[in-house]
């Protein structure tokens, strides 16, 4: 019986520990990351629920942003900004607007992320 109680405690503690980083990520997403992406990305990627998000990529929630769109892989690859399409395409938008994968596209009315914003996004993705 003691083993069962100990096992139950370990499972509960493990579940809590696994949720703690997710809760911290969600809080950071809502407070810091989404507000800076909203101006550059949300117009095409989910702000208007009546319109389909371009490329099937919706950034309105952390879960949907991490999942990615119909193409190009995961939006966020935790621990690796270089493999995260959200970061890669945003970086292209800030450094090479002529690249066809740059986000926002050159013809868009929205401004790309700044270098400081890119650094915040990179740190967010790479945080453990």
What are these regions (language model features)?
Residues 8-18:
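Hydrophobic h-region of N-terminal signal peptides that target proteins for export
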